[in-house]
Amino acid sequence: MLRAQKLHSLKSSDITAILPTEQSQKLVLAKKNGDVEVYSRDGNTLKLFQVYPDLLQNAKNDPLPPVIENFYFANELSTIFAQCKETLILLSTTNLHEYDRIIDRRGINHCWLFERSHKNKEEKNTYLIYSTINTAKMRVLIWEGRTYKNMMEASLSYRKETIRSIYPGETGITLATDLGIYHWPYNKPSLIRIEKTVKNKFPKDMISALTELKEQAEKVIEKKPKKNSHFDAQSFSSMDRMSRKSSMSSLWYRTIRNERGNKIRYTFELDGNDATPMIIDGATKKIFKVELMHNNEEPFLIATDHATFSESNSEFDHMQYLSSNLLMLYNSSTIKFVDYENGFTFLQQKIPEGIKWVKNLSGTYFLVWTSNDEVQLFSYHVDDGSEDDDQESICGDINDPDFYQLWRKVLFYKFFIDSPHSKELCVSDNPEESLDICAMKLRDLTVMWCLRIFDKFQNYMVQLERSRNSRMIRSKCEEMIIKSIFDLFIKFWAPPQLVILKVFPSAISSLVLEITGQEHHCLLKEAEEVKETYDIPPHLLNRWCLPYLTDTRRHLQNLLSKENDDESRITWCYRDREIKQSFDFFLISNHDDVDLNTMLTLIDTVLFKCYLYYNPPMVGPFIRVENHCDSHVIVTELKIRHMFKDLIDFYYKRGNHEEALKFLTDLVDELENDNTDQKQRQKIDHGVKILVIYYLKKLSNPQLDVIFTYTDWLLNRHNDSIKEILSSIFFYDSQACSSRDHLKVYGYIKKFDKLLAIQYLEFAISTFRLEGNKLHTVLIKLYLENLDIPSTRIKLKSLLETTSVYEPRTILKLLNDAIESGSDQLPTNQLNFVKYLKIFPLSKLENHKEAVHILLDEIDDYKAATSYCNDVYQSDSTKGEELLLYLYSKLVSIYDSNRNSKLILNFLQDHGSKLNSAEIYKNLPQDISLYDIGRVVSQLLKKHTSKMDETRLEKALLQVELVATTYKLNERMSSYGVLSDSHKCPICKKVISNFGTDSISWFTREGRNIITHYNCGKVLQERFNAKNEKSSRIKQKTLGEVINELNNK
């Protein structure tokens, strides 16, 4: 635990006040004769630094200088407050020069000084609070930073009311007196007496829940006749362990001193941002949490039993909160460090000279002012070699000291690691390594402690099994304990073998022996003695136990993924510690080791059984992901429950495809027996068919032979549904199907149905977006063989037009062969269709002139030819213009032969604007009608003129925009601001020098120029951005909300 060591002591007679100042490492002593001695702390020693004779008389030349009764130090103000009978004297910390006084003729009784930070404020606030003599008045003076802000005064309820403790919280000051508890808001001049006290209906933590169950179990036992049961033996088995320190004389001595603790009402706040005031009340033996409401409701107290703490520490009448849930208690002879909730002692130091006053210093030091005016400096540190079986340090059931010692160790190591001074507490050459070891020790102790708690909890639940009283509270306690235990198991990475054996139901815990081969008799010895057992209810096991298994599984998987690395370790984090751990961290000490794969098998198999017994819908999803389950357990359990779909999913995930399909095909014979009627046989046969199809459709190309084999089995057994079976297996959009050899599949399907085989090619090409051209070539051949079907012609045209995967030269050869072979057999329309199809491969080969030749000369389709040329022009205007001129020349040739100018005139009217006019007129036939050509030329001129006008207009608009933009730029560049010699940066409040070389930032905000330093400008910009973002998130009020506001006014 902790051990204190006296480092130094000094003796000075007639001391009236002591003040250690952390800032300057000084110790100030006030004496009865008015002298003030200042000692300097040099390491672990105190040396006299300076003496101020008659300090206060020299300061103000008073005839009767006041006697200093106490000192208070304000670090933020760099001020020492000296309390006298009617005066608070403000002294500078540098030379103890008096610079101000606070005088109250009513007399100053007690004084408190606090410094604390508030939310959203950078500077600390200083609170000086004092009560007056013989009046019920309280006064508080408040400084924000170094600036005095406010003074408030309020009255207590009764004249002779005594203040026990005070603490300034976030919203106000909490006062605890001998007659009540008050809240004093910072913005109000009156105290609010807290009258309302409530108690939690249900236990708030694991230990209080266990205590509640214990009390219920004791009531049940009292009602039953006495039996020599295992539980009775366990309850009284430790009676003979009572130590000498817990003898009757010790208990009597504690009873006599009990009145001191009754006067304590100590107010403090725990560490953390959302901490609320806590009050330890020795009179009621309770601890109160002050709940401060923010909607104008009065505050109230939440009471929790604190009797164990109060009774164990009743002889102490002074308290100070240190950190990490640790309190320092002291009386006239002893100092104790205890945890605030349970009162476990972590340090106990006797002071033979007697104690007047104890003050905690920064770090791991405290100062003691003894009864003989000696000042002693102590340090404290962790001493792992100290006695841990000290019964006097245990607060709890004396009949089970082992459990409470374990609990005490858990709390101690938690305090040690959480402490802000953990490195100073650690006496080691390598404190970081020692703290890591202590963190792992805390882990081991916490797991052991949780298992002990579960043992007790299990015993109590067995005793309460048939009791009908307080079932709701019992249910809440049950969930609280299980949740808390498994939260700690997750946090501390508890060894899975240990947890499964000790906590999980026996049907699941038996897997440890079955999978690892380890019996663990030492762990199961106590459980074997108990005939009645308790199993965690399914809803709690699902909610709190399964996350532990999944989290442990994740850690082991991470280790497995790093198994081939040089350092196979993962990081366990506790607080600010990050400790690299290997697989050994998950094993039980002093037991035969298991390997990582076996441990993963155990975890996954336990998960499977938990899902199977308590959450069956999760079995399927778990089976279908990568897992390490024991195959024998999975197959056996799923077969027993006829969960065949999940079983074949398991086979599939493991890659045991033939085994899975053999199981399915043999299943028909296994399920059919002599008593099965025809209808039932058909139902079984249909079910097996569905499962085999479901399995086959998931297999990929490496298992293609397996697919064909078991598809044959299906087709032989169900020859009346060949098309349905083939479609279900092969026409499936999945990654597995897309990777198959589609030509092999096509050949297989073709043996049974040629039309279905063509449909498969269409499905494969359209669904899987295949890049190879073999399937396309095969499909186009098949289409060309069936041109007499209209739908086939549509598909063929669509395939050639929209697909770019096929090889154009191969397809062109196929089309030429079709034309040559079918020139005498094919009807004219089909022959022209095949010729038309040639334009698609020719287009891909960029043989556009040949395509135009086919369209115009062979098919005689002028519209198709011009459309083709226009498409080429849209994609490439140069090639398109060349192709249009080629088409134009062919049209001129046609005119020469038939003297029909209609095609030329239509072409020039539609596409003349795309061509060079000189080329048009050069090739224009000489004998064409001037009247006809005049109209076309007129339209061409209009189009050219319109295009020229559009170009001029666009140019003018761009010039206007350029002028406007140039004007704005010049206006911006000509703006200026006057920077005077006294101009201060609005952010840092420092003068911006005119002669400096530093960069400055210039903002214009709401018509006002703001000039700052460059770096300050970044801060200002962030504020502007945050403000804009906040305003953009403000919800706009609706009309109804505005009307309601007006009505309320």
Swiss-Prot record:
CHCR repeats lie at residues 730-896. GO terms for cellular component: cytoplasm; fungal-type vacuole; fungal-type vacuole membrane; HOPS complex; vacuole-mitochondrion membrane contact site. It is a peripheral membrane protein. It is found in: Vacuole membrane. It comes from the Eukaryota. Present with 319 molecules/cell in log phase SD medium. Belongs to the VAM6/VPS39 family. This is Vacuolar morphogenesis protein 6. It comes from Saccharomyces cerevisiae (strain ATCC 204508 / S288c).
